[in-house]
Amino acid sequence: MHLKLIGLCLAAAAAMQHAPAMAQAQTQAPYKIVTASERGTYIQIGRDIAKFVAPTAGIDLAVLPSAGSAENVQRLRYEPGVKFAMVQSDVYQAFLDQDKGGNVEAGVLIRPLRVIMPLYNEEIYFIARADSELEFVHQIKEAKINVGPLLSGTAMSATTLYRQMFNGPITEVNASYLSNEEALVKLTVDKTLDVVVVVAGQPAKLLVDMKPEARKLIKLLKFDASQPESQAAVKTYFPATVRAASYPNLLTEDIPGIAVKAYLVTYDYGLGSTVAQLRQFARSLCQNFAALQTSGHPKWREVDLSLPELGRGWLYYPPMAREIRSCTAGKRVAVPSKTCTQQERVLGLCKQ
């Protein structure tokens, strides 16, 4: 009996010894960042932030996968604990356009969101079968195209690009909304698809992981900026180069491509403790930026902390913007009930 009592006392003493450490661990703010698919670039960028930035800011950052940018807007707005989101520029702009056009839900979602910083350009890949007659993006009109899951940034980019290039939406009979993996099976095995659209910053894990034999099954379509259809697209998107060095198992030479800008976004928080925590995050982001560029995903080398002027309707989050600008100045850091449109469905604004 005495031995049991002694054991209980020792256990209690040990628990009290560890209590300060446990309390200290609990002071880390349990925040979340929503990214995209497990095999995409967004989630790798999120993990870099969790590793190199969050700890110094006193944040325990959970990096969560998602369907993509449109879902991220909704989760940032409504999901408890989600303080950061990765969002593509065309998705953000589409919500603003829907708001301007009178879509009340779009306004409720997008108006309180604020930009932390622009990140980098994400390449938009158009994948066809190796034996396909298609060679260029401007040739995909009337093709059967997988645009990615609803609520994904990929779906927004694919449908917006198509609409801009060919003056109309992809017909529903030709559009599918499968995951990348499911779509590639439909493309190469079932042959019920002609094109699979993937959006990811290079080197994209999905393509990097492909074996040399993949070249016999698939190819990447080139983007010819000189074509009339292409010229309509570059008003919203950006010319890019898909490098053979990024995908040696797929490419023997660099090919011309197209890209969309990625942004790190938050909410217009007003609670004092949250504002202070986000200011610490911004300070840590600046202070650890060199580590992100040297040890993080290669896309960090394309990021610039200068915070350029944003488009109409886009707003920075002032407490974080002030912190970043102050830090960079000192450190000189470089570098409704109706028929739903396709865009509304992609954004998750269709309730029918």
Task: Tell where the protein language model's regions lie, with residue ranges.
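A structural signal for short loop-to-beta-strand junctions that line the ligand-binding cleft
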Residues: E105-L119, I124, Y247-I255
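Extracytoplasmic
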Residues: Q28-P30, G40, T56-G58, G68-E71, ...
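Pocket-flanking alpha-helical
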Residues: A50, A62-A106, A183-L187, P203-K211
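C-terminal segment of classical bacterial N-terminal signal peptides
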Residues: A13-M22
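Segments of small-molecule ligand-sensing domains
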Residues: L251, I255-Q352
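Extracytoplasmic small-molecule ligand-binding "clamshell" domains
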Residues: Q28-V34, T41-V87, L250-D254, V346
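Pocket-lining segment of extracytoplasmic ligand-binding domains
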Residues: S89, Q164, P169-G272
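Bilobed "Venus flytrap"/periplasmic-binding protein-like clamshell domains
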Residues: P30-A54, E122-K186, D190, L307
